[in-house]
Regions:
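Hydrophobic helical h-region of N-terminal Sec-dependent signal peptides
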Residues: 10-15
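N-terminal signal peptide c-region/cleavage motif recognized by signal peptidases
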Residues: 18-20
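A cross-kingdom marker for long, charged
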Residues: 271-338
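Bacterial N-terminal signal peptides that target proteins for export
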Residues: 1-9
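Structured, acidic catalytic/metal-binding patches in enzyme active sites
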Residues: 26-36, 42-286
Length: 338
């Protein structure tokens, strides 16, 4: 329950940041997502003498109809000694709390209460008429049979609508690729697995965690939440073709499409600013810096001890000028980019 509440805020950032700076103007023809067996991007290669670090760049969303062709990655994994996962934030829950069926029921009730508008209000009563009309137009276009009142707060309503629209347009999360990738990694039992993560402690009683969730949702700026809602609508209205183009580019291995676009959570992302200003995530910039430092330390160690290492990063972080690949270059490693 708490994990969902935290991720409901972060989801808006992850979902929308992938399309930041993608809009290239309106196309005369609608972009259709590619299908079939597709390889994704080539691997980046970092060299320290005879030692190699191969990096696989992930992206989300990806085309729903693609089947990831994993042979190239499978060969590298078989010949590697270690895999370094992408930087991540994880949550540490009390096992007893999660297994208690009473708490699961209480959690559903709390989640419903915190994600819905107070006093049984509806979305059209809360947001400006112009914004609601745009929301209703998108909803009617994609889901014409739905006309029941929307009682979710703007952030949640906008995020869920955007997720559903992406699925209707043939776009799905990167799990379509990362799940088979993780199966490949598990199959290679000889691999040392290095996870680079910051763990958020969510231990304690249900009451204490519920208070944290209430504080988080209560600390979100109403003005910033409306701005995030408006941005969600704008991108669903005008950038879906660009999102599909980038998803196709990733699936087919066209790396140049990603050069110069911001890392998810850039300063011009209104949903990220909403998250940053919330009480629970006030130190997110420090967390990101710590994760980057840990990943680079793991890469440095691997490049001095392993003959071959496989690593995973967001493709945007591989192609931006101040990303982790650029940091490896400043350390004097030889870089090969596709």
């Amino acid at each position: 329950m708490i994990r969902w509440l935290l991720s409901s805020v972060a989801c808006a950032t992850a979902l929308l940041a992938a399309s930041t700076a993608m809009s290239q103007g309106n196309n005369a023809l609608e972009v259709v997502t590619v299908t079939g067996r597709l390889p994704g991007p080539p691997l980046w290669r970092v060299s320290n003498g005879d030692r190699r670090l191969y990096i696989f760049g992930t992206f989300s969303p990806v085309p729903d109809g693609m089947i990831w062709e994993s042979d190239r990655v499978a060969r590298v994994l078989e010949g590697s000694q270690e895999v370094i996962f992408a930087p991540d934030i994880d949550a540490d829950f009390s096992l007893g709390l999660m297994l208690n069926p009473v708490n699961l029921f209480r959690g559903r009730r709390l989640s419903k209460r915190l994600t819905r508008l107070p006093d049984d209000a509806t979305l059209d009563e809360i947001v400006p008429a112009e914004l609601y009309d745009r929301y209703a137009a998108l909803r009617s276009r994609y889901f014409p049979r739905e006309d029941d009142p929307v009682r979710e707060r703007p952030l949640v309503a906008g995020t869920r609508l955007a997720e559903r629209i992406q699925r209707e347009e043939g776009l799905v999360s990167s799990k379509q690729v990362t799940k088979p990738l993780n199966r490949l990694i598990k199959r290679n039992r000889h691999l040392q697995q290095t996870r680079v993560e910051v763990v958020v402690s969510l231990k304690g009683s249900f009451t204490s965690l519920a208070r944290r969730a209430e504080t988080l949702m209560g600390s979100l700026s109403p003005e910033k939440e409306l701005a995030c809602f408006a941005e969600q609508l704008r991108r669903m209205e005008s950038e879906l073709d660009a999102m599909k183009s980038r998803a196709n580019a990733w699936a087919q291995g066209y790396v140049d499409e990603f050069r110069g676009i911001p890392l998810p959570g850039s300063d011009d992302d209104t949903c990220f600013l909403l998250l940053l200003e919330s009480s629970e995530f006030s130190t997110i910039e420090q967390v990101r810096s710590e994760l980057d430092a840990r990943w680079l330390a793991a890469a440095d160690r691997a490049l001095t001890t392993n003959e071959s290492t496989f690593a995973i990063l967001d493709i945007v972080d591989l192609t931006r000028e101040d990303g982790l690949l650029a940091a490896l270059r400043t350390r004097g490693y030889e870089i090969w980019e596709p």
